């Protein structure tokens, strides 16, 4: 049976794992790394780079290197968080025809689902390379606090990447799976997950194979990227005070600042002080400017104190929703790279009253949990029951713009709930069902997931028609809504897409584009390999010619030199097919050179052999000798 992989599609880094026997194994990528940067870049000549190769060239190509794309997935362009993000990244965020936030690189517009698909493709290829077989199915993780639009957009990304997404699983739940798979005793655990772009906290009861999520809370726009930006702004402000130049106006300088800030932040987790040193960061009329600044751990902690505090409020809400106190929590599991910061660990310890558990790798545990869930779905992992919850309340807009909840937050999923409504006016023949997700009392203050019309309601006074609205949330946390007129049994059903969202046609087109790109990438790789082989052949032939010029006949030498020159010209100007043809011609001509060298070597060997035979006669020296008889020998001895 083909393997199902587990993918942690992260804001900053992504990770892929697979079940091997009874345990999950993280797979190393082609660079030998266990995590892959969630970055996609488009070069000047149209090449697409993903992961480490994209990160390496980010400083020189900031406007076409896309990162932290997960913060845009499933969001509209007008969303305040999108507008905030525009000031944090050097690439362009644009408004799509459907109102969603998309990105632009080299004049091409891409949806966040497409960019995420390129990253998922890289993870898929990493797994295929390790397993030696095609991978077509996956379990993908998302922040627990992702709404329906964000979950659907992640599932779309999987489809574009050529993966059947068997399950969307919440990141803290995945981490709990990896942490608690071998725990037999009942435990109440808190998973504190602070990643690159999102924060989640989940309270779970685990033991004897049952993982029950009691509550979840979080902030989908709070993570390591925000910590980096605090340091970037501090460095930029200090530099401006000193030099009168705002580095944030220069995209290349901003990218260098961002990389330096991230590096400094990581170093300050183990050191009390570090130095940011960026020579030639900019220039003015007086000449080049350099940025050199010492940063202490206490300075960084002061810069991000409010961000750390922002993670504590969701912890309080999660405990309240679960009906437990901090003292009742047995273990606190830290997840996400940003959770390595000592001040964060201190804040968590202070809030929960105990040391957080450091036994799991915060960068890998989520992918491992996804692989375990994949194993459960495949039947390879037995006796594991996962009971997750919906993070936000779901409901519809009713008279006066009120948000009427049908499913409360932290309800165990999958779940189904129905409620009967009626018309607001006499003889109303149609109703518009507007579906929202959130916790505010007025519908307009929550996230509009979608809307649809139920038409053909028989004329009747207001309040008489019976319209049943049913919500159905599947195990992925994705919503289906139906409305039925009980009198006529007319029913209208929609699978919620983001109010913008990608249509099936959009997704199909993106799948085709991804496949075309895969072919393009394969062709490009083959072209590079052909050129490399051609260069190697040309160099080897040239070396042979130089070393054996006196042993090759004039005609053969002229033919080889002509074929070599033709290949060199093809390498400069020719197509891949032309290079292959010239390589073949040079190979054939070189065979004649080989024959000539062989004949020359054979002739030399024969000449040496013949010379050796003559020498045995010519070089012998005739010596005078006297024959002595035996009697004479005896006399000599006695003398």
From Swiss-Prot:
Pfam annotation, one family: HSP70
CDD domains according to UniProt: ASKHA_NBD_HSP70_HSPA9
Domain of life where this protein originates: Bacteria
Low complexity compositional bias, start-end: 600-615
Biased composition (Acidic residues): 616-629
Residues modified to Phosphothreonine: 198
Basic and acidic residues bias (residue ranges): 630-639
Stretches for region Disordered: 597-639
Keyword Phosphoprotein: yes
Keyword Chaperone listed: yes
Task performed by this protein: Acts as a chaperone.
Homology family: Belongs to the heat shock protein 70 family.
Protein name in the entry: Chaperone protein DnaK
Gene: dnaK
